[in-house]
């Protein structure tokens, strides 16, 4: 139908050609020009292409056209009409309604006289009427005859446009009512009262006494059988110009007004009564057949057709009926999805019931007390509940208590008579764990003593006087050409500054990694173990040793007159009692000796604490096992039968 102007299809026949620069160029449109550099639209009948500017059709307008025919084709064949795409479901419903209307002899549609109020509400619509107003339909239809509507018909058309929200005055007793009665035919049709939701009307007691339809208002005889002519809504009266209603014409409902029903309504024969036209949710359609069955008493309290099981009928009892709640009407699409979900759930429930009957045939007669097994409770003769051995919880508790009183004393006596090897092994294991705990505590006390001794040595060393002698500086200038490589970065360094460089290089690389835990360390009696600095980004506490953490601690600035103070040793381990008295800045042999000694003591203390924690966990597990071994549940479930006490004693002769 429509195409890009750069690649049109040349028609096979019915076009002239002329030569330009020695080449044959096809010509198009009513202007007979070969121009293809603009928007073009093609006829779906003769396949001729036309420029949009020549026929006054833009590219945006063409997107809404489904089938387009040129003027010549429409003149030759009046049946050809331009068809448009429908963007909304209301437009589609309007098109179908227009296509089902009767036509006159010339093929044109018969249109009623447009109502000014309705046209004002519709505005610039997008339906078929708006398309005809723009001149996009076929111009060769016979002009319709002007139709004059009676005042009653004009009033009915206006009343049909009133929405459901406008059918309430808000002042009468029915409008102020907030609960459904649950007894009328409209309530029994609702889903919350177990109905099929076919009529979809408000409770009769909640129908407005001023603005609601007369057939929907409450009247005492609504629950009694009525004639079909009284219960069914009357069809719309035909217009004066129509002689007979066409078969395709749909009859609509009218709203019965006070005083106008008896004078203007003409009864139609049963043959002329057709199915009412389906309306939207706002019009609240009424199914005539179902409504007639309701009024005739077909849906009484004991004969509801949608009752598939006797278990689903207790809602009719006033004591068990739920209180009615005001339910808002939602859109049709949402209702359809809800109906699909309910139907799917009902099918699933039916299949599940069928499977349960095949898998558990004994449940089929669960309602029959004679088919149920007897309760196993002591002295109880009542039938057991389905899928249970007892008729109630009390019977089960009584039987369990009697079983404990009967079996437990004998099991306790057997437990006391025969020795338990696992119990003896547990006692020995507890003794060994306690010895290890005692040794760990002794080791911890020793490390605490060493910690305080080291602090005293460091304090005494700082009180020494600085002394610069040539003997201590001997060998510092030797081997200046010798180089070693750093273990962290691999760079060659001088042995004189090797310790200083390696310590700083290690701290730089170590600070790039974090070691943390979600909880701080709290150990009674322990001081200066972990760093425990909180990191708000990772929400963790640092778990490095406090004296070695390069991330959260820095070496203090050394003054010029501070002494080194490192204790001097002989043969590596033997202390001489003297201290290094070189200035701390110049001593390359004892770099950071205080930090390393403190870290050594703290690391040993941490190891002892870890050992104690492991021993506490082992003790807890052993005690839990020993407690559960002679408990009520273990004695009731397990039993050891000792047939020959002499040959089955697993203890060794030394243990006896």
Swiss-Prot record:
The modification N-acetylmethionine is found at residue 1. SMART domains: PHD. Residues 1-14 have a biased composition (Acidic residues). A zinc finger (PHD-type) spans 28-76. Residues 239-249 have a biased composition (Low complexity). The modification Phosphoserine is found at residues 6, 19, 124, 224. One of its GO terms (cellular component) is nuclear speck. Residues 422-474 form a coiled coil. The modification Phosphothreonine is found at residue 227. Residues 90-120, 335-345, 359-368 have a biased composition (Basic and acidic residues). Keywords: Acetylation, Activator, Coiled coil, DNA-binding, Isopeptide bond, Metal-binding, Nucleus, Phosphoprotein, Transcription, Transcription regulation, Ubl conjugation, Zinc, Zinc-finger. Residues 321-334, 346-358 have a biased composition (Basic residues). It comes from the Eukaryota. Zn(2+) 2 binds at residues 181, 184, 187, 203. Ubiquitous. Gene3D superfamilies: Zinc/RING finger domain, C3HC4 (zinc finger). It is found in: Nucleus speckle; Nucleus. The keyword Ubl conjugation applies. Zn(2+) 1 binds at residues 169, 172, 175, 208. One of its GO terms (biological process) is regulation of DNA-templated transcription. InterPro entries: CpG-bd_C (IPR022056), Spp1/CFP1 (IPR037869), Zinc_finger_PHD-type_CS (IPR019786), Znf_CXXC (IPR002857), Znf_FYVE_PHD (IPR011011), Znf_PHD (IPR001965), Znf_PHD-finger (IPR019787), Znf_RING/FYVE/PHD (IPR013083). The acidic domain carries the potential to activate transcription. Transcriptional activator that exhibits a unique DNA binding specificity for CpG unmethylated motifs with a preference for CpGG. Component of the SET1 complex, at least composed of the catalytic subunit (SETD1A or SETD1B), WDR5, WDR82, RBBP5, ASH2L/ASH2, CXXC1/CFP1 HCFC1 and DPY30. Interacts with SETD1A. Interacts with ZNF335. Interacts with PRDM9; this interaction does not link PRDM9-activated recombination hotspot sites with DSB machinery and is not required for the hotspot recognition pathway. Interacts with histone H3K4me3. This is CXXC-type zinc finger protein 1.
């Amino acid at each position: 139908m429509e195409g890009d102007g750069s690649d049109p299809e040349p028609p096979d026949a019915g076009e002239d050609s002329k030569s330009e620069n020695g080449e044959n160029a096809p010509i198009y449109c009513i202007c007979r020009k070969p121009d293809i550099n603009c928007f073009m639209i093609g006829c779906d009948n003769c396949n001729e292409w036309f420029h949009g500017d020549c026929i006054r059709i833009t590219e945006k307008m063409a997107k809404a056209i489904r089938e387009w025919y040129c003027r010549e084709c429409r003149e030759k064949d009046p049946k050809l009409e331009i068809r448009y795409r429908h963007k909304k479901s209301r437009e589609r419903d309007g098109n179908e309604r227009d296509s089902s209307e009767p036509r006159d002899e010339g093929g044109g549609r018969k249109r009623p006289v447009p109502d000014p109020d309705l046209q004002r509400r519709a505005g610039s619509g997008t339906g078929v009427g708006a398309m005809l107003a723009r001149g996009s339909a076929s111009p060769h239809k016979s002009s319709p005859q002007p139709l004059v509507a009676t005042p009653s018909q004009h009033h009915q058309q206006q009343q049909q446009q009133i929405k459901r929200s406008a059918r309430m005055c808000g002042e009468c007793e029915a409008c102020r009512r907030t609960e459904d009665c649950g007894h009328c035919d409209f309530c029994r049709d609702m889903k919350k009262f177990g109905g099929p939701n076919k009529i979809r009307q408000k409770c009769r007691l909640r129908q407005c006494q001023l603005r609601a339809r007369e057939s929907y208002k409450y009247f005492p005889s609504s629950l009694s059988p009525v004639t079909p002519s009284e219960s069914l809504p009357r069809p719309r009266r035909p217009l004066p110009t129509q002689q007979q209603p066409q078969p395709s014409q749909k009859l609509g409902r009218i709203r019965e007004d006070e005083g106008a029903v008896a004078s203007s309504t003409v009864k139609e024969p049963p043959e002329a009564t057709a199915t009412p036209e389906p309306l939207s949710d706002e019009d609240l359609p009424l199914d005539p057949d179902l409504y007639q069955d309701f009024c005739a008493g077909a849906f009484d309290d004991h004969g509801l057709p949608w009752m598939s099981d006797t278990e689903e009928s207790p809602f009719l009892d006033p004591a068990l009926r739920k209180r009615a709640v005001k339910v808002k009407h939602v859109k049709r699409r949402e209702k359809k999805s809800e109906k699909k979900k309910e139907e799917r759930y009902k099918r699933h429930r039916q299949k599940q019931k069928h499977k349960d009957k095949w898998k558990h045939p004994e449940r089929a007669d669960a309602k029959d007390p004679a088919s149920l097994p007897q309760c196993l409770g002591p002295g109880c003769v009542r039938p057991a509940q389905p899928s249970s051995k007892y008729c109630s919880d009390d019977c089960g508790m009584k039987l369990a208590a009697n079983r404990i009183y009967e079996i437990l004393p004998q099991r306790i006596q057997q437990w006391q008579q025969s020795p338990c090897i696992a119990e003896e092994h547990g006692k020995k294991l507890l003794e060994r764990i306690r010895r290890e705990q005692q040794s760990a505590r002794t080791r911890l006390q020793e490390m605490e003593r060493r910690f305080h001794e080291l602090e005293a040595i460091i304090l005494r060393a700082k009180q020494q006087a600085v002394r610069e002698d040539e003997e201590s500086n001997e060998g510092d200038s030797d081997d200046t050409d010798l180089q070693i490589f750093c273990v962290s970065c691999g760079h060659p360094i001088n042995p004189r500054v090797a310790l200083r460089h390696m310590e700083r290089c290690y701290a730089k690389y170590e600070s790039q990694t974090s070691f943390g835990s979600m909880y701080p360390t709290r150990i009674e009696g322990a001081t200066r173990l972990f760093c425990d600095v909180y990191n708000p980004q990772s929400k963790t506490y640092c778990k490095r040793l406090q004296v070695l953490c390069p991330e959260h601690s820095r070496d203090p600035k050394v003054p010029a007159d501070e002494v080194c103070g490192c204790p001097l040793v002989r043969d590596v381990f033997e202390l001489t009692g003297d201290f290094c008295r070189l200035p701390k800045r110049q001593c390359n042999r004892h770099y950071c000796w205080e930090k390393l000694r403190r870290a050594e003591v703290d690391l040993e203390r941490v190891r002892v604490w870890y050992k104690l924690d492991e021993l506490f966990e082992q003790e807890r597990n052993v005690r839990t096992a020993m407690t559960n071994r002679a408990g009520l549940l273990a004695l009731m479930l397990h039993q050891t039968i000792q047939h020959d006490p002499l040959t089955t004693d697993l203890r060794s002769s030394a243990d006896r």
